Swiss-Prot record:
Cellular component annotations (GO), alphabetically ordered: cytoplasm; small ribosomal subunit
Ribonucleoprotein listed as a keyword: yes
Source organism (scientific name): Tropheryma whipplei (strain Twist) (Whipple's bacillus)
Domain of life: Bacteria
Keyword list, A-Z: Ribonucleoprotein, Ribosomal protein
Family, as annotated: Belongs to the bacterial ribosomal protein bS16 family.
GO molecular function, one term: structural constituent of ribosome
This protein's name: Small ribosomal subunit protein bS16
Xref: InterPro entries: Ribosomal_bS16, Ribosomal_bS16_CS, Ribosomal_bS16_dom_sf
Length: 148
């Protein structure tokens, strides 16, 4: 069985992202896979590339051939150089920022302004400047006022 390391496309129209997978060369692009060894998100800036290096090395060692696109990603991460026997392969991919560090406060916390310790929160009874519900506007005709 001829095994290939290739990209499986997932995502929306015009918003693709890929999984780097090991699959039989005769299967469809998005068909059944043997194993997923990584992810690639080209739309992000900078592009997100994550490859499980030990698993990629294993599949390369047993004869899996990468496609051109997968080979380019393996070269960027340094896995291809490691497979070819270089002593100190260098990854040109930036390490991803942790998700927790990039998150900000939830929307509910961002919307509410912090209240000072001595300051009271305004209530409905404190708002005497607003018209009450019982006030009838003067521009409403007489026949409509009586119906309400």
């Amino acid at each position: 069985m001829a095994v290939r390391i290739r990209l499986k496309r997932i995502g929306k129209v015009k918003r693709p992202f890929y999984r780097i997978v090991v699959a039989d060369s005769r299967t469809k692009r998005d068909g059944k896979v043997i194993e997923q060894v990584g992810k690639y998100h080209p739309v992000q800036n900078p592009s997100f590339i994550e490859i499980d290096s030990p698993r990629a090395q294993y599949w390369l060692s047993v004869g899996a051939k990468p496609t051109q696109q997968a080979l380019a990603l393996l070269k960027l991460t340094g896995d291809w150089a490691r497979f070819c026997g270089e002593e100190n392969p260098v990854s040109r991919v930036e390490q991803p920022v942790s998700i927790e560090a990039g998150k900000s406060a939830p929307k509910s916390r961002r919307r509410s302004a912090p209240v000072a310790a001595g300051e009271a929160t305004p209530t409905v009874s404190d708002r005497s400047d607003l018209p009450s519900v019982s006030d009838t506007p003067q521009d409403v005709p007489e026949d409509v006022r009586g119906q309400a």
